[in-house]
């Protein structure tokens, strides 16, 4: 990975930490698409994939702040703690504006078994998992 990509990733993580420090809410659309959930990210870690240096996993502890509109799940409520595993990866889509840049991925992250163990271990050590 080039130094420039490394620097740009750490810049993204600094921006993420700034949002946490300012308690900026994250919006996630309800699975039924008739509402949205607002979360505060309390803490996060990142973990580089061992066999893909252009991919970092993000493990977040989120607290639901509100539900706007309709929620497809009736038992969800303000104050619920949830964990999200997502990732950033360098785009390799030819001719895309994002080619060679970090892009956010949240759908079905694939992670090597040994990296999953390392990610969970780090999340426990840094008190992300409560």
What are these regions (language model features)?
Residues 35-38, 46, 72, 103, ...:
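Polar low-complexity intrinsically disordered regions enriched in Ser/Thr and small residues
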Residues 79-130:
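Short, compact, well-ordered microdomains
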Residues 30-33, 67, 98, 103:
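Intrinsically disordered, low-complexity segments enriched in small/polar residues
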Residues 52-56, 68-69, 90-97:
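Short, surface-exposed beta-strand/loop "edge" segments at domain boundaries and coil↔beta transitions
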Residues 59-64, 69-75, 81-90:
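Canonical SH2 domain fold
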Residues 1-65:
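Negatively charged, low-complexity tracts enriched in Asp/Glu with abundant Ser/Thr
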